[in-house]
């Protein structure tokens, strides 16, 4: 995923 949503960036963590 190129674009990283604010809510998604926490998911990646």
Swiss-Prot record:
The answer to whether the entry has keyword Secreted is yes
Sorted UniProt keywords: Pyrrolidone carboxylic acid, Secreted, Vasoactive
Which superkingdom is the protein from?
Eukaryota
Q: Which GO terms describe its biological process?
A: blood vessel diameter maintenance
Question: Where, per the database record, does this protein carry Pyrrolidone carboxylic acid?
Answer: 1
Q: Where is this site: Cleavage?
A: 10-12
> What cellular-component terms does GO give this entry?
extracellular region
> Does the record bear Secreted in its keywords?
yes
Say which family it is in: Belongs to the neurotensin family.
Question: Assembly and partners?
Answer: Interacts with NTSR1. Interacts with SORT1. Interacts with SORL1.
* Name the UniProt record assigns to this protein: Neurotensin
């Amino acid at each position: 995923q190129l674009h990283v949503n604010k809510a998604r960036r926490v998911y990646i963590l």
